[in-house]
Amino acid sequence: MIDFVKSRDTVIQKSFFEEFNSQNREMGSFAYSGNSESVWTGENITSIWKTILINETGSYCVAARPMTMDGAEFNLDLMGYSVSEDQINNDEIGIWNYISVAEMGGVLLFLSYWIWTCLHFSKIIFPAQKVICLYIFLFALNQTLQECIEEYVFSSECIKYRQFYSVYEIIDFLRTNFYRLFVIYCALGFGITRTVPKYLMIKGISIVIALCSVYWISLYKDVYVVSEIFDMIQYEVFPAIWVYSICHLLKQCTSVTTYENASKARFFRRMLNAFIFIFCASPMLHYLSNIIFGNFDYRLSVIIGDLFTFMEKIAFPCYIMFPTHNEALAYNRNVAEEAQEKMI
């Protein structure tokens, strides 16, 4: 972990990898001036571009030492660097801040529209479609915490940065596993064509909460092994869940033969097509994000990456579960019920 020391005058963007390999590096004990302060703590700085502040002399200091939540007792290695960068226009920084606010407003507007749609089609709504509201809320909360992290990452509020970052990691892990549970239940038809048993709902929620608790402990105590296990779950188990869900939906579509279940078959077929598209498109979106991140401005790359994330995590699931798709299913259900009443 690295602590950075800075003053407040000029804003620049630098590659820390380049700076640590700079020929202008000086080692020694540098004075901690009154207008300098600790501003950032993070991991793997050699691969991250950040915005930092330098003083009028064109130099800044970096104090590096290992850190954990329990504290550390190590000697500080202080390094000074000479830099010469043009000052970024404050108006340009303000524009990027407005764009971030617009992104958050778009997510909240989408959440409001989804809630209104669920209320408008309340008679034909599925339980799974109500759960989408909770998922969008977690996504919006996650984006809000991300904005708070960016707000404090280069301010004097290092403690608040660490607090926001820890909460952000937990909410992101909760949202991801909640999404996985939702995918499995939808593929099995729970909350769509059949009710969700209480014991099954309690078990699913308990598993997600237990995983989040262990993940939080691993973050708090910096347990590397646990983090590696959860990374394996993130990148290995989730594709297996998608493959299982696709196979089960394919079985559902091929097993429906009667006229009464024709609308149900169309619903599952739409889910199957969307699941296959998401499963195939996700790696491509991540690949494009990496290309854009390496060839465009950092802020622009973040915006495009957020757009891809919105398409993958929000737009596609909401398309599958959009309430207007239930009209044919509800109509055929009413026709079947009326026919059954006439027979009685």
Curated annotation (Swiss-Prot):
TM spans (from-to): 99-119, 121-141, 170-192, 199-219, 223-243, 274-294
Location of this chain's protein in the cell: Endoplasmic reticulum membrane
Main location: endoplasmic reticulum
Keyword Membrane recorded: yes
Residues in the Cytoplasmic compartment per record: 1-98, 142-169, 220-222, 295-344
Cellular component terms (Gene Ontology): endoplasmic reticulum membrane
Topology within the bilayer: Multi-pass membrane protein
Record topological domains on the Lumenal side: 120, 193-198, 244-273
Domain of life: Eukaryota
Protein's name in the database: Uncharacterized membrane protein C750.05c
Organism: Schizosaccharomyces pombe (strain 972 / ATCC 24843) (Fission yeast)
